[in-house]
């Protein structure tokens, strides 16, 4: 292609290494923009047809191309679904139809294929839902191995019954578990799962969330959920939009898009209590990523927020006034902000980022509401720090979750 390209996937035919296929997407779009074939090791390319090859809007994230090992004329492409052509792209057949069946039969977002070189009817498909196998070239699929693994974005527990655990996962919904072990988990809320929270005075009240702020509430212990997004300004939302319960009044909920919202009736109604707490929209940046709250003796709320563009804000009067306290912090994605509930002028921030000019700058502490920040990264590896918690049973103990593991000090 002559246009600026984004993600490119390439396959070299195992039967004839002169034959190469490629799919690409442009930088200004999220769909497959073209399928190409070369028969002379890439010296020249021809465009293949895309009739029936449905794109997903997520091909910057997924997208794979393979040729049948014993027939380079048979081509497979993975997007949300898996497609096959036997006529150089004149027509494509959807082999998975992930949204038309159950996720035990197939799952969206295809990442990897393996086609048996001795029997091309036998295909192994890896996607966001696990491993699926077809023994008839994609006509039917079955989920295999049922590995008890998935990618969790966030988790929470029921403080009245800590055996009850909940979490939100990548493309596999939000889960809940009462019993230990993989058999004890069940899907409670669909979509991509993110933050969750349980009312600390009533175990039946559970909050869960799908992508881009799709928050819902259950009043019956997770059996049924109702959406509570009415009244939220969702013009700019993070993929994993943060929300939290008030530290003292469990029916009060805060939700962050690019503004902070407050509900005093468990999300039935919302009020905006802040201006834009980011630096403004800039591409995909300009959303709140994290928040934390505490109570002053005056009963005023102290709330800290962090954003994907590096801005950190604080209010010490329940949202009436806000102060930008980003000065002294690197300009990076703010992954977590945590206020010390015993002393709200103390707060911690963790930051993302790789190989920056300022090395070892992933964790900071303030003791004066963000007027000054102290770098407490110490001997943490120079990788993103994603979360931080305070051990309130031990005055000086902190835990930090990073891309390289969990650390404590």
Regions found by a protein language model. Give the residues of each.
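Beta-propeller blade termini and top-face loops
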Residues: 1-409
């Amino acid at each position: 292609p002559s246009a600026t390209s984004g993600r490119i996937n390439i396959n070299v035919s195992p039967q004839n290494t002169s034959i190469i296929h490629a799919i690409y997407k442009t930088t200004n779009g999220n769909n497959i923009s073209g399928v190409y074939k070369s028969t002379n090791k890439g010296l020249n390319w021809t465009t293949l047809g895309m009739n029936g090859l449905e794109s997903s809007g997520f091909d910057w994230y997924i997208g794979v191309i393979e040729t049948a090992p014993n027939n380079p004329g048979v081509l497979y492409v993975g997007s949300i679904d898996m497609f096959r052509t036997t006529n150089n792209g004149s027509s494509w057949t959807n082999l998975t139809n992930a949204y038309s069946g159950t996720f035990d039969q197939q799952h969206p977002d295809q990442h990897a294929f393996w086609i048996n070189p001795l029997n091309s009817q036998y295909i192994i498909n890896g996607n966001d839902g696990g491993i699926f196998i077809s023994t008839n070239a994609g006509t039917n699929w079955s989920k295999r191995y049922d590995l008890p693994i998935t990618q969790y974005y966030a988790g929470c527990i029921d403080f009245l019954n800590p055996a009850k655990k909940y979490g939100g996962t990548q493309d596999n919904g939000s889960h809940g578990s009462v019993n230990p072990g993989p058999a004890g988990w069940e899907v409670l809320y669909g979509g991509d799962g993110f933050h969750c929270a349980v009312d600390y005075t009533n175990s039946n009240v559970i909050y869960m969330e799908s992508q881009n702020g799709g928050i819902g509430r259950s009043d019956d212990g997770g059996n049924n959920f109702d959406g509570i997004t009415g009244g939220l300004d969702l013009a700019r939302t993070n993929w994993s939009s943060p929300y939290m319960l008030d530290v003292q009044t469990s029916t009060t909920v805060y939700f962050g898009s690019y503004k902070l919202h407050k509900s005093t009736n468990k999300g039935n109604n919302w009020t905006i209590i802040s201006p834009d707490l980011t630096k403004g929209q800039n591409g995909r940046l300009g959303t709140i990523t994290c928040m934390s709250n505490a109570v002053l003796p005056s009963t005023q709320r102290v709330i800290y927020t962090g954003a994907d563009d590096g801005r950190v804000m604080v209010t010490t009067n329940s949202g009436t006034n806000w102060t930008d306290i980003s000065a002294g912090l690197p300009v990076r994605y703010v992954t977590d902000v945590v206020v010390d509930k015993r002393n709200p002028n103390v707060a911690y921030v963790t930051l993302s980022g790789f190989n920056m000019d300022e090395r070892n700058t992933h964790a900071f502490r303030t003791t004066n509401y963000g007027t000054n920040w102290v770098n407490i990264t110490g001997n943490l590896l120079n990788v993103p720090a994603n979360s931080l918690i305070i051990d309130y049973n031990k005055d000086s103990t902190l835990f930090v979750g990073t891309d390289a593991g969990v650390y404590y000090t």
